[in-house]
Swiss-Prot record:
G-protein coupled opioid receptor that functions as a receptor for the endogenous neuropeptide nociceptin. Ligand binding causes a conformation change that triggers signaling via guanine nucleotide-binding proteins (G proteins) and modulates the activity of down-stream effectors. Signaling via G proteins mediates inhibition of adenylate cyclase activity and calcium channel activity. Arrestins modulate signaling via G proteins and mediate the activation of alternative signaling pathways that lead to the activation of MAP kinases. It comes from Sus scrofa. Residues 1-48, 110-124, 189-211, 286-300 are extracellular. Phosphorylation at Ser-363 requires GRK3. Its main location: membrane. A lipid is attached at residue 334 (S-palmitoyl cysteine). Disulfide bonds join 123-200. PROSITE patterns: G_PROTEIN_RECEP_F1_1, G_PROTEIN_RECEP_F1_2. Keywords: Behavior, Cell membrane, Cytoplasmic vesicle, Disulfide bond, G-protein coupled receptor, Glycoprotein, Lipoprotein, Membrane, Palmitate, Phosphoprotein, Receptor, Transducer, Transmembrane, Transmembrane helix. This is Nociceptin receptor. Belongs to the G-protein coupled receptor 1 family.
Length: 370
């Protein structure tokens, strides 16, 4: 069957699929999951320097992102005061990011070698995690924005709606919705021999030239466009509300916290949109039949794809800078060993001082010989 796109473009752009974060069609009509765009098999030449740069970026993002997101989850689980509705959603976001970051060493190896060496089971797992991350991240940010809208625009109703238990239920629903896509692609994904090299592919059902574009457009709409539209509506209503009143609650401190948390969620959403828009636009344009015609354009596409992964390690940094509670908990965690050592030294000094004082007192009470 004839490819939907010109062969030279696919020979340059594709090899093994494992990179990127938007769905496309490969020459054999296999649908690639979102983060799985960039590689260099099918005989395409990928300069070693570019390979090393991409792999180095992946490893840096993996290490930094895992440390940050694991710390976020630990802080939320460890401290009771951190178990708010907003932080429950943040935990879900960190969990999804942690899962996808764990796939980066495998995807980096795939980039470096130019083929998939890890077998069928791991291929299915990586594909499923990519789709789960894409949908759970978008849905969680949407839920956070709706949660902020309720807190700002309907403060009375928020007392009943915005509870940690209900936020946990929403998180479960988000993963269930993501399973509508995640489970089927895991079933359809497999490591196959394509052009004498092993590729990790998602085989779409026949007729591929119909279901491929339909699937790609649906992924684009439901994982990006619709969530961004809902988020935009929520924040538009919140801005109008915030401009219309001086105090949202009876307390200036509570009002300050509401605005601070709303600003945090807005920044997290903005960074998500900023990181994902470039690759989403690239893939949408390709879906409309316009392909990059230069090596520079292909290189830009590769790094736009990597930018999607960078988003997964930025969120903990945003929490540390924009949320006082997270900042305090992070500082407490990082300074704990030093503080323990200082306390041990202080206790030792006090013990020595006490012994010296006792010795001096004893010497004063002992009668001196005449």
């Amino acid at each position: 069957m004839e490819s939907l796109f010109p062969a030279p473009f696919w020979e340059v752009l594709y090899g093994s699929p494992l990179q990127g974060n938007l769905s496309l069609l490969s020459p054999n009509h296999s649908l690639l999951p979102p983060h799985l765009l960039l590689n260099a098999s099918h005989g395409a030449f990928l300069p070693l320097g570019l390979k090393v740069t991409i792999v180095g970026l992946y490893l840096a993002v993996c290490v930094g992102g895992l440390l940050g997101n694991c710390l976020v989850m630990y802080v939320i689980l460890r401290h009771t005061k951190m178990k708010t509705a907003t932080n429950i959603y943040i935990f879900n976001l960190a969990l999804a990011d942690t899962a996808v970051l764990l796939t980066l060493p495998f995807q980096g190896t795939d980039v470096l070698l130019g083929f998939w060496p890890f077998g069928n089971a791991l291929c299915k797992a990586v594909i499923a995690i990519d789709y789960y991350n894409m949908f759970t991240s978008a849905f969680t940010l949407t839920a956070m924005s709706v949660d902020r809208y309720v807190a700002i625009c309907h403060p009375i109703r928020a007392l009943d709606v915005r509870t940690s238990s209900k936020a946990q239920a929403v998180n479960v629903a988000i993963w269930a919705l993501a399973s509508i896509v995640g489970v089927p692609v895991a079933i359809m994904g497999s490591a196959q021999v394509e052009d004498e090299e092993i590729e990790c592919l998602v085989e779409i059902p026949a007729p591929q030239d119909y279901w491929g574009p339909v699937f790609a457009v649906c992924i684009f709409l439901f994982s990006f466009v619709i969530p961004v539209l809902i988020i935009s509506v929520c924040y538009s209503l919140m801005v109008r509300r915030l401009r219309g009143v001086r105090l949202l609650s009876g307390s200036r401190e509570k009002d300050r916290n509401l605005r601070r948390i709303t600003r945090l969620v807005l920044v997290v959403v903005a960074v998500f949109v900023g990181c994902w828009t470039p690759v989403q636009v690239f893939v949408l344009v390709q879906g409309l039949g316009v392909q990059p015609g230069s090596e520079t354009a292909v290189a830009v596409l590769r790094f736009c794809t990597a930018l999607g992964y960078v988003n997964s390690c930025l969120n903990p940094i945003l929490y540390a800078f924009l949320d006082e509670n997270f900042k305090a908990c992070f500082r407490k965690f990082c300074c704990a060993p030093t503080r323990r050592r200082e306390m041990q030294v202080s206790d030792r000094v006090r013990s020595i001082a006490k012994d010296v004082a006792l010795a001096c007192k004893t010497s004063e009470t002992v009668p001196r010989p005449a």
